Amino acid sequence: MAKEKTVYVCTNCGQDSPKWVGKCPSCGAWNTYVEEIIRKEPANKRPVSGLESVKSKPVTLNDITGGDEPRIDMHDEELNRVLGGGLVPGSLVLLGGEPGIGKSTLVLQTVLHLPDKKVLYISGEESARQLKLRADRIPHNSSDCLIVCETSLEQIYVHIKNTRPDLVIIDSIQTISTETIDSSPGSLVQVRECSASILKFAKETNTPVILIGHINKEGSIAGPKVLEHIVDTVLQFEGDQHYMYRIPVSYTHLRAHE
């Protein structure tokens, strides 16, 4: 039977507490705690020692291969630049920006110019017809971009397993939810848990994933601040509604270059 509990989460840094507090002990912000109800399914019983279920194996640095694996060329000079020379296989990239600034269009335009890569574009906000209309306005030379409209993380993994893509796009992380958490999509807990699960998937399969995320009125990524520390790279898409210019600003964690 699922266990249910109530926690309070800081909207600024993601710190949680069993009770509401006025000042966050982690980041020092005032009145940032909101209530979240979490229901987690019971995990499968494991041996007390854990030895029988261990899948990882310690190895020496000399036994590790793939250290010089080339980055994926995004066929966009500016995007390659802010990514440090291209997309790192197995990396998790967060692209943030104001709603309507052009995040989805930028990503769709980019993946449609990757003729040698199979891309799975997961849309949780727009229908397949809406994406088709957007794509028709973009000159492209790729027909190997698969579109699926889905918001369940478990179903997303099924689609990935069946299609085996070279690159996964999730638009947007605020629309995705996992069945193991009884909370609405976009909540602090859902965003954090889904992002952590996607990061684990990216590392285990060496599949790069680009998450699209919205920013709030304060100019930060919507969801817990800890989301920016889960991903390998944060790209923030900035601009002005009165001009056509768009400026990609990059913040890259050291983990992306390991």
What are these regions (language model features)?
Residues 2-5, 16-93, 113, 117-121:
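Detector for small/aliphatic-rich hydrophobic stretches
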Residues 16, 30-33, 85-86, 113-114, ...:
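Conserved, well-folded catalytic cores of nucleic-acid-processing
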Residues 22, 82, 131, 171, ...:
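Residue-level signature of catalytic and energy-coupling elements of molecular machines
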Residues 73-79, 147-151, 217:
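Short gly/ser/thr-rich secondary-structure transition/capping motifs
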Residues 90, 98-101, 108-197:
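Conserved inter-motif catalytic segment of the P-loop NTP-binding fold
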Residues 167-248:
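Conserved P-loop NTPase nucleotide-binding/switch module
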Residues 252-258:
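Conserved small/polar residues in nucleotide/adenosyl-binding loops
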